C-alpha cells in the first residue's frame, strides 16, 4: 500500500483537476509539456513518479483499483476494456474547444499559470483534502505577494513556452469561446436591422434640429443628385443604391410628411432650389399616387385651417398653404406636400412669408425670376397676382397632369376643404380683382410652363415663419397701398 500512495494521491489530484474546470489545471496538452520539469520548482524532486505517468494512463487507475475489487470483477473489466477502441472517445478538450475536428490548441501558459500548475501539484500532494477552488485562491494570493526576483523563474519559463508554442503553431490565433461570437452575431444583425429602420428617422431628427439654421440642410448633406432615385426625402445612408425598392422611399415620404405637418411653421427641412425635377425618377413620382392622403388630415394644424382670417400675418400665410398651389409648403393636403416632394419646389419657404409681408420690394425682380412653378399664390408679390389668377386654373391643372398624380387632385379634399376646389378650378373671383394687379399680367407667360427654379441668387430671401420671433419680419406697412386685405383674404383662403 505504501508504494501505491503516490499513485492514489496523483489520481485524486487529477480527478480534482478534471472536475474543477474554472481553475487553472493540468490538462491534456500541458501534461506532456516541458513545463513540469522546467518550471523552476522542485516538483520533480519531490515526486519523480509524476512525470513518468501521463495523466489518465489506464494502467495507473487499474493498479490503484486492484485492491478494491475482487479478481473476477477486475478480469471482467479488463476484458471489456480490451475490446473497446478508445480512439472513439472524444477528448473533452476537443469537444469543448472547437466545433471542427482539428484538436484545440491551448494558449501558452503565462507566468502565473506556470507557477500555479507547479505549486498546485506540490500542494495537492501535501494536502490532498484541499478543494481545488480553495487551492486556486491561495495560489493567487501567494502570487501577488511574490517579488520580481521570486517571479523571475516563472516569467522566464512562460517566455520559453511562448516561443516554443509559436514554433509549434505558427498560425495560431487566439479565439475566445464561440458562445460569445454567436451573441455578437445576433446583436450585429439586430443592429443592422435597426440601422435600416431607424436611420431615416434619426436623420430626420438631425435635420429638424438643423433646419432653423439652414433650410438647405439636406442639400448640404447630400447633393440633390445623390438620391435622385428616391423621393427627395431624408437622405438614407450613403451606401444605399439609388435604385432602392420603392418601399423605403414610401416610408421616407410618410415619415417626412409628419415633420412637415407638425412643424408647419418651421422653415422647410429640405432646400429644393438646387434640385431639378428631371432628376426625380418617374417611378417615384408615380408611386406617390398610391398614398392614402386622408391620414394626413389629422396633422393639419388648427391655425392652418382654411377659415383663418388673413389678418394674422404668419397664420394666414400658413393657411394659404392649403391652396392646391401651395403643395410645396405644408401638409396642405398631405397630398400636396407630396407634390412638393416630387417637384422639389423651392420650399416655398414653407416658412411662407406672411403673405402680406410678401416682399413687395421684390416684385420687380420676381417677374423674370418667376419661372418657378407658381405653387404658392401668396408667395408672389402683389404685382404677380393677376398673372397667377389668369393662368392658374389652366396651368395648375396642366401642371398636375404633367406630374401625373391624379390621386392628389383636390377632389380628395372636396368635403373637408370645399374652398380649395372652388379656388383651384374657379379663379373668377380673383380674376375680377385683376384690376389690382393688371400691370404685371404680361409677365405671366413663363410662370408655369417650366419647372426650373430660381437659383439661390435669384430667390428672394424670405423670412421663415419659424423664425418670426427672432427675425424681424417685414412690417405690414410695406405692402403696397393698393393691395387691400379683403383681396388677400380671398387669395389665401382657397
Swiss-Prot record:
Annotated consequence of substituting residue 181 to D: Sumoylation. Initiates trunk neural crest delamination. Allows cooperating with SNAI2 to trigger neural crest delamination. Allows interaction with SNAI2
Annotated motif 9aaTAD 2, positions: 292-300
Protein biosynthesis recorded as keyword: no
Annotated region described as Transactivation domain (TAM), given as residue ranges: 224-309
Record PROSITE patterns: HMG_BOX_2
Biased composition (Low complexity): 27-42, 211-222, 326-337, 388-402
PTM summary: Phosphorylated at Ser-181 in the developing neural tube. Phosphorylation at either Ser-64 or Ser-181 is required for sumoylation, but phosphorylation is not dependent on sumoylation. Sumoylation is enhanced by PKA. Phosphorylation is required for interaction with SNAI2 to trigger neural crest delamination and for an efficient trunk neural crest delamination, whereas sumoylation plays a less significant role. Phosphorylation and sumoylation are induced by BMP signaling pathway.
Start-end of Basic and acidic residues biased regions: 56-66, 159-174
Outcome of mutating residue 64 to D: Sumoylation. Initiates trunk neural crest delamination. Allows cooperating with SNAI2 to trigger neural crest delamination. Allows interaction with SNAI2
Residue ranges, annotated region (Transactivation domain (TAC)): 372-494
Induction remarks: By BMP2 during chondrogenesis.
Biased composition range(s): Polar residues: 378-387, 470-494
Subcellular compartments: Nucleus
Region (Dimerization (DIM)): 63-103
Chain residue ranges for the region called Disordered: 1-66, 159-275, 326-402, 462-494
Modified residues (Phosphoserine): 64, 181
Annotated GO CC locations: nucleoplasm; nucleus; transcription regulator complex
UniProt DNA-binding region: 105-173
GO biological process: anterior head development; aortic valve morphogenesis; astrocyte fate commitment; bone mineralization; branching involved in ureteric bud morphogenesis; bronchus cartilage development; canonical Wnt signaling pathway; cartilage condensation
Functional description taken from the UniProt entry: Transcription factor that plays a key role in chondrocytes differentiation and skeletal development. Specifically binds the 5'-ACAAAG-3' DNA motif present in enhancers and super-enhancers and promotes expression of genes important for chondrogenesis, including COL2A1. Plays a central role in successive steps of chondrocyte differentiation. Absolutely required for precartilaginous condensation, the first step in chondrogenesis during which skeletal progenitors differentiate into prechondrocytes.
Family annotation (PANTHER family): SOX100B, TRANSCRIPTION FACTOR SOX-9
Free-text note regarding domains: The 9aaTAD motif is a transactivation domain present in a large number of yeast and animal transcription factors.
Protein name as annotated: Transcription factor SOX-9
Organism annotation: Gallus gallus
Source species taxonomy: Eukaryota, Metazoa, Chordata, Craniata, Vertebrata
Gene this protein is translated from: SOX9
